């Protein structure tokens, strides 16, 4: 009896093993027909509007790619995760995507802090990475597998300072969030260039936890600067603008691309402010209007710059991957991305410099009657 039971167990285990091998083979076969792209962004938390918009823009482009037959016969499969805007959450999600989901390419993160943390991990794993919207310069520095779609903090900081000079401004106060890589990077580049332009620059700082800016703004009001430059994200900027209005501050407010989204809840207090961007909803460019129509049809809301950059990231990957004969080669993929040089993007013509950062024109936006309006391209 013991012999029969043992034999039955053996036969049962052999059957299980056979099923396991077959299922693994089926999975491997299935995986060969897809390109797995990991996507991480804040879908909840303080910068959820950024994460949701970026990922939605990217998913819209992927939907279009798959509907048109995919990439060389392969469909794109998205593996998605919510970082909640937290660096450690983003790191954990990325590690899981590499070790368990076996992604081929990574798109993310959305903001600079998590992107800076993930970039060296992507480089080490040799996973081609594109951050659609992470602007900190060091994200790509020295990492040949890491690219971006947006311009960098130094790039836009320099251009905004030159733009301010072109408008004849002679005195500017900079408000810097010391707890934000984005704010510090943009602030430093702006201050350096503004001083080169002969502009008188003062600076005041606050922390990421601050909510009451009245004491700081009262001090700033005493400077009587023509411009107050605030390089930060829309939620914090909204509080600053609201309190500045209460204090009767009439300086011209300016900012970087983190302002996009200000129109949702703070359009009234932001009226007249000007900020750097790469996308204007009223831009008559055919690519812009076609994208806006498709996005509104898909999500029933107007897109912001983050959605446009997410969509453009999909276009960059589509173009690059179609030029790769062996899609299993990560080296071939990252080289194809490097060689991208396209004019058919929503955010304008783009080519990569030596550090895999895009060179493109800066679009200046003015908040008018609670909406974003194209001011000029500079």
Segments (PLM) and residue ranges:
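Periplasmic-binding protein-like
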Residues: 97-110, 130-132, 173-176, 224-234, ...
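Segments of small-molecule ligand-sensing domains
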Residues: 297-307, 318-372
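Extracellular/periplasmic bilobed ligand-binding domains
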Residues: 186-276
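An alpha-beta-alpha
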Residues: 146-208, 227, 317
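Extracytoplasmic "Venus flytrap"
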Residues: 38-59, 81-88, 110-111, 175-184, ...
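Beta-alpha junction/loop-to-helix N-cap segments that form part of ligand/metal-binding clefts
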Residues: 27-34, 49-56, 68-140, 149, ...
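Short, low-complexity disordered leader/linker segments with a strong preference
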Residues: 1-36, 378
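Extracellular/periplasmic periplasmic-binding protein-like sensory domains
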Residues: 241-311, 366, 371-377
């Amino acid at each position: 009896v013991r012999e029969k039971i043992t034999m039955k167990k053996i036969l049962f285990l052999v059957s299980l093993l056979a099923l396991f091998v077959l299922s693994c083979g089926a999975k491997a076969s299935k995986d060969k027909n897809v390109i797995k792209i990991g996507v991480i962004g804040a879908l909840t938390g303080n910068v959820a509007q950024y994460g949701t918009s970026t990922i939605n823009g990217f998913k819209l482009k992927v939907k279009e790619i798959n509907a048109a037959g995919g990439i060389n016969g392969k469909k794109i499969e998205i593996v998605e995760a919510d970082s909640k805007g937290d660096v450690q959450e983003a790191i954990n999600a990325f590690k899981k995507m590499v070790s368990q989901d076996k992604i081929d390419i990574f798109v993310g993160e959305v903001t600079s802090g998590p992107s800076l943390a993930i970039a060296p991990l992507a480089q080490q794993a040799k996973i081609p990475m594109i951050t659609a919207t992470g602007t900190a310069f060091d994200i790509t520095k020295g990492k040949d597998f890491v690219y971006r779609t947006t311009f960098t903090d130094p790039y836009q900081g320099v251009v905004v300072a030159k733009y301010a000079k072109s408008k004849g401004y002679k005195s500017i106060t900079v408000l810097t969030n010391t707890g934000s890589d984005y704010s510090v990077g943009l602030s430093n580049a702006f201050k350096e260039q503004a001083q080169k332009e002969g502009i008188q620059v003062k600076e005041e700082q606050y922390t990421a936890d601050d909510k009451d800016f009245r004491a700081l703004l009262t001090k700033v009001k005493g400077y009587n600067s023509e411009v107050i430059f605030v390089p930060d994200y829309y939620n914090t900027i909204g509080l600053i603008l609201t309190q500045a209005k209460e204090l009767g501050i009439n300086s011209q407010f300016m900012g970087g691309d983190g302002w996009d989204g200000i129109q949702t809840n703070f359009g009234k207090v932001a009226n007249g402010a000007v900020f750097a961007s790469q996308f204007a909803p009223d831009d008559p460019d055919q690519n812009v209007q076609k994208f806006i129509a498709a996005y509104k049809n898909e999500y029933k809301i107007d897109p912001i710059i983050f959605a446009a950059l997410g969509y453009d990231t999909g276009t960059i990957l589509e173009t690059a991957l179609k030029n790769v004969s062996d899609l299993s080669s990560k080296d071939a993929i990252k080289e194809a991305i490097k060689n991208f040089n396209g004019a058919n993007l929503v955010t304008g013509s783009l080519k990569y410099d030596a550090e895999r950062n895009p060179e493109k024109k800066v679009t200046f936006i003015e908040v008018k009657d609670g909406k974003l309006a194209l001011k000029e391209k500079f």
